[in-house]
Amino acid sequence: MFTMKKSLLFLFFLGTISLSFCEEERGADEDDGGEMTEEEKRGVLDTLKNVAIGVAKGAGTGVLKALLCQLDKSC
């Protein structure tokens, strides 16, 4: 009876080890996929937002300078 328990415990141990290896491989495959994480999405959106703000500030400055020039007639 003891040898049977020992062999079953050994098989359970081997099954657990092989299952953990399968989960690690599956996790590695999922990480290499084309999906973006929330942090990556946030980083991309922050970059796009900063670029848009910079462009808007540049355009706004140009428009304000043109209006000031027209109002003062100093062009």
UniProtKB/Swiss-Prot annotation:
Keyword Signal: yes
GO cellular-component term (any): extracellular region
Keyword Disulfide bond: yes
Source organism superkingdom: Eukaryota
Compartment annotation: Secreted
UniProt cross-references to Pfam families, sorted A to Z: Antimicrobial_2, FSAP_sig_propep
Signal peptide extent: 1-22
Gene Ontology biological process terms, A to Z: defense response to fungus; defense response to Gram-negative bacterium; defense response to Gram-positive bacterium; hemolysis in another organism
Cystines in this chain: C69-C75
Tissue specificity field: Expressed by the skin glands.
Main location: secreted
Propeptide residues per the UniProt entry: 23-40
Transmembrane stretches, start-end: none
Keywords: Amphibian defense peptide, Antibiotic, Antimicrobial, Cleavage on pair of basic residues, Cytolysis, Disulfide bond, Fungicide, Hemolysis, Secreted, Signal
InterPro entries according to UniProt: Antimicrobial_frog_2, Frog_antimicrobial_propeptide
Function: Antimicrobial peptide. Active against some Gram-negative and a variety of Gram-positive bacterial strains. Active against fungus C.glabrata 090902 but not against C.albicans ATCC 10231. Shows hemolytic activity against human erythrocytes.
Family of this protein: Belongs to the frog skin active peptide (FSAP) family. Brevinin subfamily.
Record's protein name: Brevinin-2SN2
Source species: Sylvirana spinulosa
